[in-house]
Amino acid sequence: MQKKWLLGVVFLVVTVMLAACSESAEGEETGSDDVIDIVWYPNESGNDLKTARDAIGDQIAEATGKEVEHHLTTDYAIAIETIVNNNADVAFMGAQGYIEASDQNDAIQPIVVSTGPSGTLDDAMYHSWLAVKVEDQDDFKVDGEFSLDTLEDTRFSFVSNSSTSGFVVPSSTIIGHFADKDLTEEDLMEGGPLFSQVLFGGSHQGSAVNLLNDSADVAAFCDSCVNNYVEVAEGEENTVGSVYRVKDDAAEPFNTVTGSEFMLMSVTPVLNAPFVANMDALGQEDYDLIQEVFASDEMANNEDIFVPEDSDASGLFSKSDQERFVPVEDEWFNPIRELSQN
């Protein structure tokens, strides 16, 4: 009788524990914990952008009533894996990174993107650059004009093969230009098929520094990720032939190449990067609250987030007119999706 009683107690305890574990797991899946984890790419993980990250985190914390933690990374793949594997609720990532993440986990959904000066998606874009050192410009010209023909047998630096503007867009352009070679993206990831050597900077800043410290002859990187460190020295912004100079007080990693100059040999518009959510980790309620606060006037008018264009402060986004965040659907990223499938 006593044995039966003990077995009954053990069974009851185990049942309660299993139920508690089940409820805990269910709570985790629906995003019911009290912390929202935001994972950032290496480009946005630097100390110089802490104020901007914290400002966004503060807005999310106020909207949801939850603590916000920032997950900083040094590698694109780590950031993507973190959001895919339910170890983060929100991520700021390029279009290609979002596409890769959503392909691996259909719970990944876009929240918002930043607009262009119009305040709409019509001009929500930044720019992918191919840059060379000013003193080497003639090596990349044919009849006085920059030509992609000159890229053959050069040392080339990309950002990461998961980077939209630092790999997918420029590689598509290069593959199209050298159509007779039947190149693939994989061919551009190593020396031999086209380039003599291929480097990956790990971030847009890192790719630019590869050029400026003479590790590479040509580098791909984007305007928005280096704007805090460089200034136009000659010409106009985002124009082929314009010269940019690294600021004297530039933060890491540009502090080792201050005063260096580079010239743009190619400029290509790219769709703006989204903030995305893992719906299994975050949950619909918090998703709706976060999307609402991102799209609010309060967020749009926060100068720590949208830094006025005449300010010397470092920021993630700049404000020249009506820039703000707006909700976006998955279909908006199809042009980038099509590039990566070609």
Residue ranges and their predicted role:
Residues 22-24:
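Bacterial signal peptide processing site
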Residues 114-178:
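A conserved helix-loop-strand patch within extracytoplasmic ligand-binding domains
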Residues 155, 166-283:
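Pocket-lining segment of extracytoplasmic ligand-binding domains
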Residues 42, 72-76, 87-99, 103-107, ...:
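Beta->alpha turn/N-cap motifs
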Residues 16-20:
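C-terminal motif of bacterial Sec signal peptides marking the signal peptidase cleavage site
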Residues 42, 127-141, 266-284:
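A bilobed periplasmic-binding-protein/Venus flytrap-type ligand-binding module shared by bacterial periplasmic
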Residues 30-47, 66-72, 155-157:
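Short, well-ordered beta-strand elements
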Residues 34-36, 40, 44-55, 277, ...:
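An extracytoplasmic/periplasmic, membrane-proximal ligand-sensing/linker region
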